[in-house]
């Protein structure tokens, strides 16, 4: 499993020496990762990266990654028929999550780091406009946004610019056990995708814990990316494009109206269970069995 992708090079040598099956599992891309272009590489080093990547992708018995967009990228670099086995959630948390009582306020929460690349500017603008317009009865009185995790200064400045300081609570750190309780008491779970060139392939591990809670997910990101595929497959939420401010406003209004009508209920969706680590482990077992069988 990589990164670090040096692990694949170790596996490559073991595969050669002992003639044993080799699965190269990419939790993140190699040369397509978003910060790769920022590395201070010489032409020789860049060529070496691509050469080693090609060797790994073409010599492994099977290449696996966590999303469909990344699978296409790896195939473009030489891999054949890349298998997609996504990240998932720990099935032991499901019952604990579902016993949590909802907040009385209309609470939208984001769990995890909100860096500069995750500054959903149009979301904050839409929220600020809805508060100022004051056309939704009790919206400003009920609204509460919680950001649980580190928040970049650029995000804080955007919040201030839209006069939302009194509606947003930033909680820098709480233990994981408390995090899952906090997210399950929220009416809506926010997911901000990095606004970067590889945004289509970004599918944070957090989305799976979100799905396990059964709370509706509101994501900001590419509507044709891997996160959109997962949300559509599981009917766990909605995703709106980074720049679609009107679309964002419409979703917030719809969610708030459902909150008022007590319709933001916790959903038990059997499709979500396919993304428990137990189910995903079975997928991996089947993959390993196939590889072993083809060698016999």
Language-model regions: role of each:
Residues 61, 167-169, 183-200:
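Acidic donor-binding loop of glycosyltransferase active sites
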Residues 243-247, 260-290:
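A charged, aromatic-enriched C-terminal amphipathic alpha-helix characteristic of glycosyltransferases
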Residues 135-149, 153-178:
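Nucleotide-activated donor-binding/catalytic signature segment of Leloir-type glycosyltransferases, i.e.
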Residues 36, 89-104:
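Acidic anion/phosphate-binding donor-loop and adjacent secondary structure
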Residues 101-118, 124-128, 280:
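Conserved donor-binding/catalytic core segment of Leloir-type glycosyltransferases
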Residues 69, 85-88:
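Carbohydrate-associated surface elements
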Residues 6-17, 30-31, 43-63:
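Membrane-proximal helix-turn-helix segments that form the acceptor-binding/catalytic region
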């Amino acid at each position: 499993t990589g990164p670090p992708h040096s692990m694949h090079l170790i596996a490559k040598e073991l595969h050669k020496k002992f003639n044993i099956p080799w699965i190269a599992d990419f939790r993140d891309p190699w040369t397509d990762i978003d910060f790769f272009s920022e590395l201070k590489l010489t032409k020789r080093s860049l060529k070496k990266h691509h050469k080693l990547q090609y060797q790994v992708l073409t010599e492994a018995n099977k290449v696996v990654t966590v999303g469909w967009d990344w699978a296409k990228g790896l195939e473009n670099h030489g891999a054949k028929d890349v298998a997609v086995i996504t990240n998932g959630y720990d099935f032991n948390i499901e019952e604990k999550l579902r016993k949590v009582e909802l907040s009385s306020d209309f609470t939208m929460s984001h769990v995890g780091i909100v860096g500069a690349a995750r500054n959903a500017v149009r979301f904050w603008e839409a929220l600020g406009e809805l508060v100022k317009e004051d056309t939704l009865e009790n919206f400003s009185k009920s609204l509460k946004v919680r950001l649980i995790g580190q928040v970049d200064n650029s995000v804080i400045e955007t919040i201030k610019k839209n006069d939302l300081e009194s509606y947003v609570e930033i909680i820098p750190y709480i233990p994981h056990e408390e995090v899952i309780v906090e997210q399950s008491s929220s009416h809506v779970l926010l997911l901000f995708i990095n606004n970067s060139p590889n945004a289509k392939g970004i599918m944070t591990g957090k989305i799976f814990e979100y799905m396990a809670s059964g709370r509706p997910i509101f994501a900001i990101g590419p509507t044709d990316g891997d996160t959109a595929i997962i949300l559509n497959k599981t009917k766990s939420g909605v995703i709106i494009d980074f720049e679609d401010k009107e679309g964002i406003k419409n979703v917030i209004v719809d969610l708030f109206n459902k909150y008022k009508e007590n319709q933001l209920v916790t959903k038990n969706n059997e499709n979500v269970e396919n993304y428990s680590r137990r189910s995903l482990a079975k997928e991996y077992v089947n993959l390993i069995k196939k590889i072993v069988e083809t060698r016999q």
